[in-house]
């Protein structure tokens, strides 16, 4: 395995945490948003990492709470004129790529992703040009321009199977941008892969020694790990998988306690589906370090009720647009993934 040398820019300033709302304020916002969703024939699609009140609102209004793959599928099936995407920028762009005739709006277009930031298209494209014999496989957590440069798009719920398929065909792979997920896939498939050197700031913070200490305190707890985590964290897992796969593991495993190494936004759905089980966030501090994200994506946290209401009242400045030429290339890569995952489901 080899790594390209570009990582997320140093000194990047993360967005401030939003001011929390009181229960009464949440109720008032929710009531107004529900009315606006009806008036605009709009549907709310939320990622598992958004805050609990956002996920609850999506469920209450007939929307969708899901991983990025199912979020992409949902918008194509729904008859709404407007899709409100509560997540990060690449999710809104993916929705627009797949449903160009619908209005796609986000609570804020500033909600980005460290993997996207750390994979600028010019540098990534130049890296790909150095290896013209390789198939370019990129994680969904990337811009439309990077997707257009790729041969395949994958999410964490299908990446292993798609790379395994390509390896069986004898293809050599360029993988980007998450080095930890790439390392996990390479280890499990044996595929010939060269990696871009990106990482998720949330998963990259999990601490190995602190997790071992937590396991010692809760020896009966199962450890659930997202493969965006460092290799040393993955090695301590009882189950490794995407958000939807980790939720399923929490449901099916016999443990009554779980230590979870992914964004703590996932606890809403885990606790909803497993009310008799207890969940602990894997440690992101310790070993002489304090946490920056503390197991919650700062950009996911930008998707507040106030921002959703504002986007519905006036989408100007919050609507997602993609370059139509880039869309064509990105759509081909996305459709390869969607077609492949459709065969997986059979």
Curated annotation (Swiss-Prot):
Keyword check for Lipid biosynthesis: no
Co-factor note (free text): Binds 1 [4Fe-4S] cluster per subunit.
Catalysed reaction, written as an equation: iminosuccinate + dihydroxyacetone phosphate = quinolinate + phosphate + 2 H2O + H(+)
Biological process, per Gene Ontology: 'de novo' NAD biosynthetic process from L-aspartate
Location, primary (coarse class): cytoplasm
InterPro entries: NadA (IPR003473), NadA_sf (IPR036094), Quinolinate_synth_A_type1 (IPR023513)
Gene Ontology annotations for the cellular component aspect, listed alphabetically: cytosol
Pfam families named in the record: NadA
Residues that bind [4Fe-4S] cluster: 113, 200, 297
SUPFAM superfamilies in the cross-refs: NadA-like
Family the entry assigns: Belongs to the quinolinate synthase family. Type 1 subfamily.
Function: Catalyzes the condensation of iminoaspartate with dihydroxyacetone phosphate to form quinolinate.
Protein name: Quinolinate synthase
Organism: Pseudoalteromonas translucida (strain TAC 125)
Gene name per UniProt: nadA
